[in-house]
C-alpha cells in the first residue's frame, strides 16, 4: 500500500539517535497505527513493546534480530518482523525510508 486514507498524522516527529532516526505516527480510524520514518546511514539498536512489521520502502540495510547470530540484508520492498518485548539492530548502509506497523 503506497498511501493511506482517512488517517490522522501526528505533526511532531519522534527523534532518536541525535536526529539520525525520525518518525511520525499515522493513526487509523480503528485506532491502529503505523510510523513512517527515515534512518540516516549508521548503526542503531531498537527495543520493541509490541510486535512490529518493518517495511523498507527505500534504501539498503542489514538487520540482526535478538538471539540471531547472522545479519540479514534487507532492501527496497522487503520487510521483516520483530516479536513483542524484543530488540533488533540495524546497519543502515544508505538512507532508509521505512514504515513500521504495530501489531497488537
Curated annotation (Swiss-Prot):
Keywords: Glycosyltransferase, Transferase
Catalysed reactions, as listed in the record: a purine D-ribonucleoside + phosphate = a purine nucleobase + alpha-D-ribose 1-phosphate; adenosine + phosphate = alpha-D-ribose 1-phosphate + adenine; cytidine + phosphate = cytosine + alpha-D-ribose 1-phosphate; guanosine + phosphate = alpha-D-ribose 1-phosphate + guanine
Entry keyword annotation includes 4Fe-4S: no
InterPro entries from the UniProt entry: Ppnp (IPR009664), RmlC-like_jellyroll (IPR014710), RmlC_Cupin_sf (IPR011051)
MF (Gene Ontology): guanosine phosphorylase activity; purine-nucleoside phosphorylase activity; thymidine phosphorylase activity; uridine phosphorylase activity
Glycosyltransferase listed as a keyword: yes
Annotated GO CC locations: cytosol
Family annotation (Pfam families): Ppnp
EC numbers, comma separated: 2.4.2.1, 2.4.2.2
Function: Catalyzes the phosphorolysis of diverse nucleosides, yielding D-ribose 1-phosphate and the respective free bases. Can use uridine, adenosine, guanosine, cytidine, thymidine, inosine and xanthosine as substrates. Also catalyzes the reverse reactions.
Family: Belongs to the nucleoside phosphorylase PpnP family.
PANTHER family documented for this protein: PYRIMIDINE/PURINE NUCLEOSIDE PHOSPHORYLASE, PYRIMIDINE_PURINE NUCLEOSIDE PHOSPHORYLASE
Protein name from the UniProt record: Pyrimidine/purine nucleoside phosphorylase
Source organism of the structure: Colwellia psychrerythraea (strain 34H / ATCC BAA-681)
Gene: ppnP
